[in-house]
Amino acid sequence: MSDFEPFYNVDLSYEDNYARGPFGEFAAALRGDVPAGEAASPAKSSFLGIPVDLPFGIPAGPLLNERFTTAAFRMGFDIATYKTVRSRAWGCNPFPNVLAVHPTSADGSLTPGSAELDEGVLADADYRLPISISNSFGVPSRDPDEWQPDMRRAIAAAGPGKKEYAEQNVSKEMEQTMEAQP
């Protein structure tokens, strides 16, 4: 790899990432070594009816807990999705569970109708930049007694436009999660 250090360390287990991450620039953002992403002007876009500066974010997969979402917000992402949770603790699939994905095209894209879509894409542990990954965590979850307070801290750390969406939707999502799973 290069000097670039991803915020999720693929050489560590999910549990180690949860306990020790995030890494790289995201860790620097948590320490305050990187200026917080602040809105300099009114929001320019919206996402699900909530004003945001840029409707671009990070999906739930690698944002394991409040430290990861807070770092994402501080790095300037307006949409940081907290890792999917369950109504009870659930372990992660065995390590290794992240692979680098290498489409054959020079720009890394997949073309509709290409043989690669039928035959498959090379996936291995060769993490070259630019990097694309695929994971199979298995929807792990901490016990609700742990993740619910952590999620509240994540919401509290969100800034304008980010916090409003979370406050409007998280309580409803927590209720649905608790009702949907045994």
Could you describe each region identified by the protein language model?
Residues 60-66:
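Short beta->alpha connector loops
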Residues 8-9, 13-14, 18-22, 27, ...:
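Active-site entrance/lid segments in N-terminal catalytic domains of soluble metabolic enzymes
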Residues 1-59:
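N-terminal basic, low-complexity leaders that serve as flexible interaction/assembly modules and, when applicable
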Residues 46-51, 55, 61, 84, ...:
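Residue-level preference for alpha-helix termini and adjacent loops
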